[in-house]
């Protein structure tokens, strides 16, 4: 089946090689290692994977990248609700770096030098409980 908006076969899209983040992460660690509080590769745990690595904070993701047509097709064909989709799939967000906001522009520039789009997708706030909020084009989801 074709992903119409991309004019490519869905199977080829799913099986296309995944980018390795090793070179860009190595470059980021050269200058920012001591500023990084955490890193999460969102494959194998989706957008909720961060919950395995935090305690008593509220992770808020409210500036997500636009959703890829592939994930829209998967959701439509499977009938999976969007909350579950964000739990299972990375939704196009593959790597997260948790660090103070004042260093984000440096890291974004490094990513861009490797031709990788990057941006601040959210923030972490103090909380009495571990919590994740995803505010996306597909809805507001609490985990």
Which residues does each predicted region cover?
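Glycine-/charge-enriched secondary-structure boundary and capping motifs
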Residues: 4-15, 19-143
């Amino acid at each position: 089946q074709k992903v119409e908006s991309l004019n490519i076969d869905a199977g080829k899209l799913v099986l296309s090689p995944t980018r390795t983040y090793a070179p860009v992460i190595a470059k980021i660690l050269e200058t920012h290692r001591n500023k990084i509080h955490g890193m999460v590769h969102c494959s194998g745990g989706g957008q909720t994977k961060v919950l395995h690595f935090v305690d008593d904070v509220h992770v808020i993701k409210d500036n997500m990248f636009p959703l890829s047509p592939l994930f829209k097709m998967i959701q439509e064909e499977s009938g999976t609700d969007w909350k579950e989709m964000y739990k299972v799939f990375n939704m196009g967000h593959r790597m997260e770096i948790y660090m103070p906001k004042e260093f984000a522009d440096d890291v974004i520039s490094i990513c861009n030098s490797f031709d990788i789009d990057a941006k601040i997708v959210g923030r972490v706030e103090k909380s009495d409980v571990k919590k994740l909020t995803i505010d996306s084009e597909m809805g507001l989801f609490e985990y």
